[in-house]
Amino acid sequence: MQLETFQQIDRILDLDLDAKTIRVEAQVPEHSTIFEGHFPGFPIMPGVLLTEAMAQSSGWLLLGVMKFERMPFLAMVKEAKMRGFVSPGQLLTIEAKIEHEGSGFAVTSAKARVGTELKCSADLTFRHIPFPDPALRVHMDAMAHKIGFPLQAIMQ
C-alpha cells in the first residue's frame, strides 16, 4: 500500500470475470505518518482506508468486467463493518464480488481478512461512466500493469 498516493492494492491474486470475483493483496506498511495520529502507542489502520481498499478492489473487478471501457467511481457505502484491528505490517487479502450491475451502477460486496480472520466488510455501490479524460485511462493502464492486472482476461 502507498497510503499517501491512495494506492491501496499491491497485487491481484485472482480475477474471475465469469464468476465476477476478484482477490487481491494489500500489504499494510510498517511505517506511515497516518499511524502517528491513529493512534499513538496503538497504531491501527483507519476504517475509512480499509473501506477504500475494499472499494479499490471492487473497482478493479468492475474495470475488468467492463473491459476497461468505463471507469467506476464509488457512490455509496452500506453495511460497512469493522470487525477487528489491522496493524502496521499485516497483509490484507481482499475479496470482492459483483452482486448487481445495470443502468450505469454496480453493487459489490467486499471482505478483507488478515490470514483467515475477517477484519472488515461492506456493500459498495459504484457509478460507472466512460473515461472522462484520456489521461485517467493512461494512468489506470499503468496501474493495472503495476499490480498485475491480467489484461489478457479482458481481451477474450
PLM feature spans:
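HotDog/MaoC-like acyl-thioester-processing domains
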Residues: 21, 88, 99-156
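Short aromatic-glycine motifs in intrinsically disordered, low-complexity regions
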Residues: 1-3, 67
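Catalytic strand-loop segment that frames the active site of acyl-thioester-processing enzymes
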Residues: 4-45
